[in-house]
Amino acid sequence: MEQSVANLVDMRDVSFTRGNRCIFDNISLTVPRGKITAIMGPSGIGKTTLLRLIGGQIAPDHGEILFDGENIPAMSRSRLYTVRKRMSMLFQSGALFTDMNVFDNVAYPLREHTQLPAPLLHSTVMMKLEAVGLRGAAKLMPSELSGGMARRAALARAIALEPDLIMFDEPFVGQDPITMGVLVKLISELNSALGVTCVVVSHDVPEVLSIADHAWILADKKIVAHGSAQALQANPDPRVRQFLDGIADGPVPFRYPAGDYHADLLPGS
């Protein structure tokens, strides 16, 4: 029981394959309640897939994925729908509705899932926009926003229903240093102010480790390391060092496997 209380998400011995490719081989990880957890690893390792497993969008081949003590893969469709209201996902693209202004984008989940009277809905939306610094942009369309503003608008929508869990899929990708700093600050402040549990998938090592309470590194279908930022920086595992230090060649090779070089230089080879 204590395990369920301490960890909002608890993945136990989870395996998942896509076609003939094994993505995860018997992995286990936990997401402590009210903390910021980072998921890191090389491109194509399955980090976004892990978020989809937690959200119940796809099911594992075997293993348990507990959310607040309930096994997500075993839930009925109606129960999963109810539980998902306690989760929110910030997509890499932001995924704003292009035909709605910023206010209506943030109001959308409130209109879909609550019966708030119009004045209270208005106040709630404006408070969420104020939290991300976009109250003055409420009437703008997504096409009028910069990339960073669009991410912040999407974040305001993600917190509209005050979820227990927010999952961030590469929130810092393609952002300039100022916007990246703003997003790092917002994630940290929302975690502190609301007590919301955050899972952040990111390649941006310095930024995500600066706010993560705990981090997990995926490689070779497994969890290869986990711990605090300090513990990971001291980890000597070559796979960890290559990823954290950005080393070009190592366990993840620089060159794609190929045949004899001289033979390939000949025409018709």
UniProtKB/Swiss-Prot annotation:
In which organism is this protein found?
Escherichia coli (strain K12)
The identity of this protein, by name, is: Intermembrane phospholipid transport system ATP-binding protein MlaF
Q: State the Gene Ontology BP annotations.
A: intermembrane phospholipid transfer; phospholipid transport
Domain ABC transporter, chain residue ranges per copy: 9-245
Functional note: Part of the ABC transporter complex MlaFEDB, which is involved in a phospholipid transport pathway that maintains lipid asymmetry in the outer membrane by retrograde trafficking of phospholipids from the outer membrane to the inner membrane. Responsible for energy coupling to the transport system.
Q: Write down the membrane topology.
A: Peripheral membrane protein
GO CC field = membrane; phospholipid-translocating ATPase complex; plasma membrane
Instruction: Kindly state which keywords UniProt assigns to this record, in alphabetical order.
Output: ATP-binding, Cell inner membrane, Cell membrane, Membrane, Nucleotide-binding, Translocase, Transport
Consequence of gene loss (knockout): Mutation leads to accumulation of phospholipid in the outer leaflet of the outer membrane and increased outer membrane permeability. It confers sensitivity to SDS-EDTA.
Positions bound to ATP: G41, P42, S43, G44, I45, G46, K47, T48
List, alphabetically, the Gene3D superfamilies matched.
P-loop containing nucleotide triphosphate hydrolases
